[in-house]
């Protein structure tokens, strides 16, 4: 009889132990599941709150009838790109034709190298991203918090007249999102309008590549129009600093920079 009672006690002890072990395992699984859900929710929230900026680059590579090549100016892309990227901002690159946008050969010369361009030259990942810009016609302002246009002479030929670019800029502006442009890129405001039909820069403080700077690079008679003159004729309150000095202007949702040296100040304002 004593043996039977002892055996019953042992069996009971084993059953209780197994029940406790099963309960602990269940709680552990639930805890792990909850942790995974929390991690997923956190990642989702971070994705929602992460700022997104659209960069729009020129696809035009012919410098008028000179037989020389143009495109976008490396510093005007690289300096803002890395400044924003290093702050955790997500950047998407677009161009009218998509794919690899042309780089102005002069901007790659040793005389125009900066820390940002040197970083770009060694950055194979960003070079690969740049080679796969999306077509501008597929870009939607609803997917971004702001839009930025790097300069380069190419802009005055294509983006200044591009219907998709014009509509996109107006869409950003009308949805209270910043529009930034540097050097020749303020050419994008040539045909942009307010809802009342007036020029988007009318009555706004703006800057851009100066007449003097264009004369210095001997392209006054080559470009289809002068950025400074266009901004003034469209009613912009145009201001500038000494040629080649860094200078950026912010007026409401519009942010503009005078020249390549103004690239980083424009990005800081953005």
Where are these regions (language model features)?
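Residue-level detector of intrinsically disordered, flexible termini
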Residues: 1, 16-18, 145
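Catalytic nucleophile serine of serine hydrolases
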Residues: 183
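Bacterial N-terminal signal peptides that target proteins for export
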Residues: 1-12
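Bacterial N-terminal signal peptides
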Residues: 11-21
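Extended, subdomain-level signal for the structured scaffold at the beginning of enzyme domains
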Residues: 25-175, 187-270
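Conserved, well-structured core segments that form or line functional sites
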Residues: 176-180
